[in-house]
């Protein structure tokens, strides 16, 4: 839980409370930009988050694919029942290292790949349908990593991600399965597979803390009804799990 209060100095005070009996590591704190904007003179280019020792910590302004700021995020640890205090001020943002990244990979049949400092994933794109492999699948592929660095660009450039060169590898075969975390509609007593890989991919935000993408799928048959799918995926630094919103429209 987060509480915002104003102070006499040009700053917003944020109190983050862990009200559970469980230690929380690298939890993402998200504050609506409408609340941040109450700080006079603040912009996405100068917003700074300070911890209780007055040290700047990495933060990211989310745009969610638009041109206007939507939210501010940063990460923190918290012991059970612990509260931590932060300040939001206008200042000089440091050059935070990117720990989350995603992009379309046209050089590999339009894969969409995304990662953080712990793990990488990919979905298969439209060009793969007409490749020699001719693969159509909603499945999500997982790349395991032995490094905290971002690897997508390097592994694709290397041309072989099925061998571990010391920084991890792709050791799973997705095929026509759901892979790691994909979903399908269930109707009329059966699952219904889409007829194509994703049609469009739009990166919404891209680090340093969160990468997110919106993917759309062409209409496919679900028990006699044409259905479209919009999939929104986000991955935060230091986490191994994605958030996925699957929006089916018929």
Where on the chain are the PLM-derived regions?
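Residues within well-ordered beta-strands of beta-sheet-rich folds
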Residues: 85-87, 214, 243-247
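Short, structured patches in soluble enzyme cores that scaffold and shape functional sites
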Residues: 125, 215-219, 248
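Short, well-ordered beta-strand segments enriched in hydrophobic/aromatic residues
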Residues: 12-18, 118, 231, 242-248
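Solvent-exposed loop and beta-edge segments used for protein-protein assembly and interaction
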Residues: 21-25, 66-68, 78-80, 106-108, ...
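Bacterial Sec-dependent signal peptides at the C-terminal "C-region" and cleavage site
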Residues: 1-13
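Alpha-mannosidase-like glycoside hydrolase catalytic domains involved in N-glycan trimming
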Residues: 10-102, 135
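Extended, loop-rich substrate-binding clefts of extracytoplasmic carbohydrate-active enzymes
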Residues: 153-238
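Solvent-exposed N-terminal domain segments of exported/luminal and surface proteins
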Residues: 87, 92-192
